[in-house]
């Protein structure tokens, strides 16, 4: 069960607790930016995640559909996450054994642009009961993965992976000139 052990990266990274309740992983989820495969807790720079990632969903039946949610629970900053969760991407009706490009994009991908601190970017995969209509939220900030799953009767997640991202040096901010 994901989130049941102290050494589980989803517990250590506080994904279980801040975003999700403990769950059982039953499907494979592969997320990659270029050649870089996302593994729990890895560090990716904002310049590496500007383009929509390649997402491959496991499963063994194309008649089973999945919903993918990507959120930042640390918006606008980890010390003051008053926009928690910030919705970066929402794709539904992804057939099993395929990828996000085969699903219905409800909210287009917005690349992470953290300004302060280390942000966790979380990909959560849910198995749907069947094809369904999902409406785009009115805004991206203060999204709740738990409430979304309840609203659309998605149950517990079937897979999750996350990475850490922080502002790159030299990417803006105060400059002092002699």
Curated annotation (Swiss-Prot):
Tissue specificity comment: Expressed in leaf vascular tissues. Specifically expressed in the phloem including companion cells.
Record localization: Cytoplasm; Nucleus; Endoplasmic reticulum
PROSITE patterns the record matches: PBP (PS01220)
Main location: cytoplasm
Keyword Cytoplasm: yes
Keywords (A to Z) from UniProt: Cytoplasm, Developmental protein, Differentiation, Endoplasmic reticulum, Flowering, Nucleus
Expression induction: Expressed with a circadian rhythm showing a peak at dawn and then decreasing to reach the lowest levels early in the night in SD conditions.
Stored Pfam families: PBP (PF01161)
Gene3D superfamilies attached to this UniProt entry: PEBP-like
GO biological process: cell differentiation; flower development; inflorescence development; photoperiodism, flowering; regulation of flower development; regulation of timing of transition from vegetative to reproductive phase; vegetative to reproductive phase transition of meristem
Cellular component GO terms, alphabetical: endoplasmic reticulum; nucleus
InterPro entries recorded: PEBP, PEBP-like_sf, PEBP_euk, Phosphatidylethanolamine-bd_CS
Keyword Endoplasmic reticulum attached: yes
CDD domains the record matches: PEBP_euk
Similarity annotation: Belongs to the phosphatidylethanolamine-binding protein family.
Assembly and binders: Interacts with FTIP1.
Function, in words: Probable mobile flower-promoting signal (florigen) that moves from the leaf to the shoot apical meristem (SAM) and induces flowering. Promotes the transition from vegetative growth to flowering under long day (LD) conditions. Acts upstream of MADS14 and MADS15. May also participate in the promotion of flowering under short day (SD) conditions.
Protein name listed in UniProt: Protein RICE FLOWERING LOCUS T 1
Organism: Oryza sativa subsp. japonica (Rice)
Gene that this polypeptide is encoded by: RFT1
């Amino acid at each position: 069960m994901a989130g049941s052990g102290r050494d589980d990266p989803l517990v250590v990274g506080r994904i279980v607790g801040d975003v999700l309740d403990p769950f059982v992983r039953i499907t494979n989820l592969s997320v990659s930016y270029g050649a870089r495969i996302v593994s729990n807790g890895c560090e990716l720079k904002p310049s590496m995640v500007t383009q929509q990632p390649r997402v491959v969903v496991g499963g063994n039946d194309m008649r089973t559909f999945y919903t993918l949610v990507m959120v930042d629970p640390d918006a606008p900053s980890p010390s003051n996450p008053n926009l928690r969760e910030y919705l970066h991407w929402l794709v539904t009706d992804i057939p099993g054994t395929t990828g996000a490009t085969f699903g219905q994009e409800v909210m287009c991908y917005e690349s992470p642009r953290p300004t302060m601190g280390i942000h966790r970017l979380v990909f959560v995969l849910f198995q749907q009961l069947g094809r369904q209509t999902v409406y785009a939220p009115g805004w991206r900030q203060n999204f709740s993965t738990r409430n979304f799953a309840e609203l659309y009767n998605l149950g517990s997640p079937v897979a999750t992976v996350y990475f850490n991202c922080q502002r790159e040096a030299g990417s803006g901010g105060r400059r002092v000139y002699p």
